[in-house]
């Protein structure tokens, strides 16, 4: 069984566009793929428990909305708390794909920066391993499919899902890590993150 941890780093983890996009993506996983889904804004475990769940994963799927050109604050908090696990078995050598939602702009930049951040933690990105779904792009695909052939849409989610699972099933290569200034992990309760009520236009 291939285990994928799905992290929802958005501010509306229960009912937002990112939550729906992640659900659409994971619906393409085959029966041999087990999903451990974590809504970071609603997570109430400990830092150590979070690290253990990531450590048990064969791959990661990380989702977030776009907030003023960046990812959600719950995801930023996650990255800060997980920094002591940089280049450890929690992240090292694991494929990580990124799925970003946005209204109309900045999502591609957020996705590329997030993928690069995960690489610095020790992960690697599969082919076609990150994408940004926009309200504008989805609307275009619905109204003028020919004009939207080169714009990310729902139809691209199975590719992202397939490539992540294929990458997660590749035998772990003998990668090497450079030296990092390692912080000491703190196994404390996960700090409560704030979330937002539904407000952004739904498009998924």
Labelled PLM ranges:
Residues 1-87, 144-204:
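N-terminal beta1-alpha1-beta2 submodule of the flavodoxin-like/Rossmannoid cofactor-binding fold
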Residues 92-140, 152:
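Short, glycine-/small-residue-rich phosphate/pyrophosphate-handling segment
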């Amino acid at each position: 069984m291939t285990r994928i941890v799905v992290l929802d780093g958005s501010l509306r983890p229960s009912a937002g566009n990112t939550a729906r996009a992640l659900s659409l993506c994971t619906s393409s996983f085959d029966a041999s793929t087990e999903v451990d889904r974590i809504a970071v804004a609603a997570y109430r475990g400990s830092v150590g428990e979070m690290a253990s769940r990531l450590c048990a994963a064969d791959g990661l799927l990380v989702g977030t909305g776009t907030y003023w050109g960046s990812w959600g604050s719950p995801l930023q908090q996650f990255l800060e708390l997980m920094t002591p696990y940089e280049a450890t078995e929690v992240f090292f050598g694991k494929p990580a794909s990124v799925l970003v939602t946005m209204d109309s702009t900045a999502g591609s930049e957020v996705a590329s920066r997030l993928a690069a951040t995960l690489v610095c933690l020790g992960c690697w990105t599969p082919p076609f391993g990150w994408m940004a779904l926009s309200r504008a792009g989805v609307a275009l695909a619905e109204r003028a499919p020919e004009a939207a052939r080169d714009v990310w849409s729902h139809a691209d989610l199975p590719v992202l899902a397939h490539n992540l699972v294929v990458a997660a099933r590749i035998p772990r290569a003998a990668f090497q890590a450079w030296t990092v200034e390692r912080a000491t992990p703190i196994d404390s309760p996960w700090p409560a993150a704030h979330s937002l009520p539904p407000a952004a236009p739904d498009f998924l």
